[in-house]
Amino acid sequence: MFGKPEGKPKGLNWLYRDTYIGKRKGITLGFSFAMQNDIDQELISDTQGPAPGINGQGKPSPGAGSVQVRVPYMILPNPITTPEVRNHPVDMRMYGADLAIHYGPLSFILEAGQHQFKNVFLDAQKLSEDFKNNWFIIKGAYALNPKSTTVFEPYVSYYIWDPDIKEDSKGRAYGDAANFIKGNKAGKEKATLGKISVTSLGVNIWYTKAKLMSLTFEYQIINEERNEITPLPFNSALSFSRHLPLIFLRFCSQSFPNSSPYLKYCPF
């Protein structure tokens, strides 16, 4: 850490996400590592949605996996129908690095990392597979009027979630990040796995006198591997906090291919 420490002025590091709205000049560099060995594979397998993997025709079969899963759950062989995965030991590793630069009204955030699962069982021909899921985040913001009670801070951000997708000996795909929007690589059905990227343009409106409320307007362009969500979303967020983590309420309007636009309420 260089320059003014994080957390000063008091509370700004958690009252305002990724920004000090012009009240800090400093640089923070961080690294992280985590590991856990001998995890039963069935404990990292989502058993709520389609399984056993996405087959060559893209048709999901009932039993395991979910379109909403994220680390540490993945679409893997169903422990109910594939007893070999029960008590099968999997090793997990996580590596990360992040950089935060706050220089007056300018804020710049960079984060990258990898989540690994080693010795994953897929089938009798693929007894030990390694999955390496990568992510990357970059965000820049600038407070236009940092000395005002109501601060306007436009920002731009880019996020990538790049999961490792592997096939078993029968061509069934396993891994993280699933979507069911368009046809798969075989051009059939509506099941795919792959990378997700999100580009966001927005503005934060901070009411610094109360230190309890902010309003965010955000426009997102979301791309998924072999799929693209029509870039028509418009989000707003309202947050409150009193000695608790911020609670964000977001209203998202998105249009999907071959379907009508819809409005969803999604807290985050």
UniProtKB/Swiss-Prot annotation:
InterPro entries: Porin_dom_sf
Region Disordered: start-end pairs: 45-64
Protein name: Uncharacterized protein aq_1121
Organism: Aquifex aeolicus (strain VF5)
